[in-house]
Regions:
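A short helix-breaking turn/cap at a secondary-structure junction
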Residues: 116-196
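Short acidic, glycine/serine/threonine-rich loops at helix termini
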Residues: 19, 59-62, 104-109, 126-127, ...
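Glycine/threonine-rich beta-strand-loop-alpha-helix active-site module
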Residues: 99-126
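Short, mixed-charge, low-aromatic patches
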Residues: 39-43, 101-110, 154-162
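Conserved active-site and cofactor/substrate-binding residues in soluble primary-metabolism enzymes
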Residues: 32-36, 80, 97, 107-110, ...
Length: 196
């Protein structure tokens, strides 16, 4: 974590940058302390590069974020700013959150890895989420190793939410193994997909 450049989704408080929730009514909102996971990263040497755009309140009005691979296509949902920054290789990793598909959908659209740990495995304190009873804190990353190591670190350092358990296992991800077999499944609509 020490020296790692990190982006922070604009739903997490940062003491040195405004937390606007992508809403005009919070244009001047400044938190007095970092969110728990931001504090953990900062105190262990991460370089908080800036805030990444989100949908308004993490819900509706999309930000001006563009898909780094095709400007005509969507970058995804609420964590799209984090996904686009990592997908464009501006950052190796960025903090995000998901209640429905806001981590995994943008990662698929912007060609990066998303890791969404179990609910409550990473402390949500200082995050402003539209659905706190369903929102998971997670990350976007350019590599599986960075995604796993950052989530594991946050879970162990910022701690889990009260009543929840931290991520188990080693701080390093398991080694990749060749699968016994692969399956390719064609779902309805596959034939409509351009072959290019």
């Amino acid at each position: 974590i020490d020296g790692m450049p990190v982006g922070v989704m604009d739903l997490f408080d940062t003491q040195d940058m405004p937390t606007r929730l992508n809403s005009a009514i919070f244009a001047d909102r400044q938190a007095h302390q970092d969110a728990a996971c931001v504090y953990a990263m900062r105190t262990h040497g991460a370089a908080i590069i800036g805030k990444t755009a989100t949908t308004e309140f993490g819900l509706a009005t999309p930000p001006g974020t563009r898909n780094p691979y095709d400007y005509a296509r969507s970058p995804g949902g609420a964590s799209s700013g984090s996904a686009a920054a990592v997908g464009a290789r501006m950052l190796p990793t960025a903090l995000g959150a998901q209640a429905m598909g806001s981590l995994v959908q943008p990662s698929g659209y912007c060609a990066n890895y998303a890791f969404k740990p179990s609910f409550g495995a990473i402390n949500r304190g200082g995050g402003h989420f539209p659905c706190p009873s369903a929102t998971h804190v997670g990350v976007h990353s350019g590599t599986l190793r960075d995604a796993w190591e950052l989530c594991w670190f946050l879970s162990r350092t910022a701690g889990p939410d009260a009543g929840h358990t931290a991520i188990a296992g080693s701080p390093q991800p398991a080694e990749a193994r060749k699968p016994h077999r692969l399956v390719r499944m064609f779902t309805p609509g596959w034939e409509l997909t351009p072959q290019s």
